[in-house]
């Protein structure tokens, strides 16, 4: 499973799955025109030559195409998954067999997860990465927290708040014992991070506001060709895939409660409605609530929805959205799942520690909780990402959008010296990403005449919208 050396080559579930993984990667490549066009554009130019990239992002077949794109562009890459359940073991095996150090397998413990994250930050010769591809911000967090500990070692004496913190601090304690300036050296060599998801971007902005951000960051999530496609259309397909693979339930006729109506929530609400469910939306934001209502969804509180809901989906990026008290009041046989990045949207720890419920594992990532009155609920993927824990995540085509943005962001950070801040990719690159995907689905663009372009004040070749435009 591993090779013994100063720097580990890989750790995956089963390297013999590599051939299967390679066959699926070849299929995905045909569905990911943005990444393949980027490879062709930079063929022979190696714009990432010399870059050491640490990737913390779901180790799926689609991610394998991203990894091999970065390698073809000249980067030295090490990779781990950003979720304990999201790895596709045949994808990890194929990447390991191709010679890329990957540390990921489906069903990691928290200790294993943070060990894997540590491995991607340790390159040959004692070097750290100079670029990070992050999803949720855990690789970035490890560096920043380690840096803080080196400034204040007493942090290691504090009692961890939960199992996740305990596992993370255990790794950081080991690193500190080996080299009490390790993370200062890593941070000094960093050119930047590109962040994939809403939750990770939120972390970056928080660190920037507090003056704690150590290196530049590009917010890939808020590229239009990411948030309005991956978050919306990706979730519209992969949510139902996860629920159905986990439970085989008929969605038509059920009442689905979607908590949150941002881009992800919109995709989930439309997904459930397209299958014939009656959808109830909960929201804190009056604008999003009004949008949901104007789309014909009932908008109310979860407390009122508990009397009707059969399927619950959290999409908020917040914590304690579904509490233990909520779950105790749900209808018999209710299905509870999350599609936000972290597992704290649902109070899973409180449910597991509740003496009035018995947990019965049905199959991997499907647990039944039987309450004392005989009612039960089903929790999917232990409250983690249902589309990746119980299925295979978003389809390749929509991930090509997101990962082309990631690739362009990595080139941008490597080629330029940014000040420490959180940036977005410029509009012309957003439009380029979209343009690369049009031919695959038979789209033909209209071309402005010079007179038309002058009339509305834009270049003939774009960009066509101002930065403040909301798509």
Swiss-Prot record:
Domain of life, per lineage: Bacteria
Annotated binding of NAD(+), by residue: 197-199, 231, 260-265, 283, 318, 339-341, 387
Keyword terms: Cytoplasm, Hydrolase, NAD, One-carbon metabolism
Stored InterPro entries: Adenosylhomocyst_ase-like_sf, Adenosylhomocysteinase-like, Ado_hCys_hydrolase_NAD-bd, NAD(P)-bd_dom_sf, S-Ado-L-homoCys_hydrolase_CS
Any Gene Ontology biological process: L-homocysteine biosynthetic process
The protein's annotated pathway: Amino-acid biosynthesis; L-homocysteine biosynthesis; L-homocysteine from S-adenosyl-L-homocysteine: step 1/1
Enzyme Commission (EC) number: 3.13.2.1
Co-factor note (free text): Binds 1 NAD(+) per subunit.
CDD domains recorded: SAHH
Cellular localisation: Cytoplasm
Catalytic activity of the protein: S-adenosyl-L-homocysteine + H2O = L-homocysteine + adenosine
Listed cofactors: NAD(+)
HAMAP family: AdoHcyase
Protein family (similarity comment): Belongs to the adenosylhomocysteinase family.
Gene that this sequence comes from: ahcY
Protein's name in the database: Adenosylhomocysteinase
Sequence positions that bind substrate: 60, 135, 196, 226, 230
Gene Ontology CC terms, in alphabetical order: cytosol
Function, in words: May play a key role in the regulation of the intracellular concentration of adenosylhomocysteine.
One term of GO molecular function: adenosylhomocysteinase activity
Disulfide bridge map: none
